[in-house]
Each structure stands twice: as structure tokens, then as C-alpha cells.
């Protein structure tokens, strides 16, 4: 008998099918140092947070990403990358911000969501039953439309930033997810 099926980007979930995290980008070559940079930057603490919101994404990877940058590029409380930045610069700029817009990528879950949590910042995502189930134990600001985000909304949800600072990073790992999923399947 099947106790549980755990699948990444399994939009049709429920019952025995449970969402699995996509996680951070895997090393794609010997020279790919993104994971090392992430590990280094996530422990650095000497950052000021002058920005409430960081917006940085490739607008060509999904239709829903188009036009989001235009919503925030003229706000002094938002940091918007008009063009692609290096991964190291991306992490530095993320550390300068409290929240980050995380639109879906090629699939509904993407690396960005997890990078933001590893950096102890708050992802801002569009409400979706799959994502809400997957991220139910993490500080996420849920919106129906990115256009509804204002500085006041972010200020009113500052408690999520405090929660993000207290994330136990081990709980974002694949072994933790595996152990939790197996435990739930056996003892639920």
C-alpha cells in the first residue's frame, strides 16, 4: 500500500499526494559557486535593511512575471533590479531588504522562494492552495495580486520579518522534510 506520495510542483495534491519543496539551486558544474555563496551570505549579519521590498526576477520565464517591476520601480521603499545582477549582488541586495516578491517561475514553486527563506527574509507570493500548503509553516506574505502591495502593507506585516529572523535553517533541509513526511505518513 502507498502511504504517501511526495512530489515537487504537483499542483494536483491532496489525500496521499503532498507537496515537496523545490529547494535551492543545485550545483550545475564544478565552477558553479551559487550554493557556496548562499551559505556564506546567509550567515553574514552586518547588513542594514533600508528597503522594505526587493524585486528581481527574469520576466521571460513566466507570463505572470511581466509588469511586476513597473509597479514598484518608482518607490523609494523598494529596490528593483531592471536588469539581471550577479548572484552575489542578488544575495547582497536581498539582505538589504525585508520582503521579496516571489512570482512563480517555470513551475509554481521555484528556487527563489527557498533562497529568500534561507536568507531569513519574507517571500511575498500570490495565494495558491499548493503554495499555501507547502509554505504553511514559514513566514510568507500572501497576496491576491502583487499590485496590492504598499509600504503600509509591508509595515503592517513586519511581524513576518521577525519570524523570518527566527527560522531554524535546518528545517528547510531535505533530510528534515523527508523525516517529517515519513513520520506523518506512518503516524497520521
Identify the function of each model-found stretch:
Residues 1-111, 118-141, 153-188:
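Nucleotide-sugar donor-binding catalytic core of glycosyltransferases
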Residues 146-147:
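Short helix-start
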Amino acid at each position: 500500500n502507498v502511504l504517501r506520495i511526495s512530489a515537487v510542483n504537483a499542483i494536483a495534491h491532496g489525500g496521499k499526494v503532498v507537496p515537496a519543496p523545490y529547494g535551492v539551486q543545485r550545483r550545475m558544474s564544478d565552477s558553479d559557486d551559487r550554493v557556496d555563496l548562499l551559505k556564506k551570505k546567509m550567515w553574514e549579519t552586518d547588513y542594514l535593511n533600508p528597503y522594505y521590498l526587493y524585486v528581481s526576477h527574469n520576466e521571460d520565464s513566466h507570463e505572470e512575471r511581466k509588469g511586476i517591476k513597473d509597479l514598484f520601480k518608482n518607490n523609494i521603499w523598494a529596490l528593483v533590479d531592471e536588469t539581471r545582477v550577479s548572484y552575489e549582488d542578488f544575495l547582497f541586495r536581498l539582505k538589504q531588504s525585508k520582503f521579496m516578491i516571489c512570482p512563480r517561475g517555470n513551475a509554481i514553486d521555484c528556487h527563489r522562494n527557498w533562497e529568500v527563506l534561507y536568507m531569513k527574509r519574507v517571500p511575498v507570493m500570490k495565494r495558491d492552495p499548493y503554495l499555501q500548503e507547502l509554505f504553511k509553516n514559514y513566514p510568507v506574505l500572501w497576496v491576491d495580486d502583487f499590485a496590492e502591495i504598499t509600504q503600509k502593507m509591508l509595515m503592517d506585516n513586519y511581524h513576518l520579518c521577525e519570524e523570518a529572523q527566527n527560522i531554524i535553517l535546518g528545517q528547510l533541509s531535505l533530510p528534515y522534510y523527508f523525516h517529517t513526511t515519513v513520520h506523518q505518513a506512518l503516524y497520521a
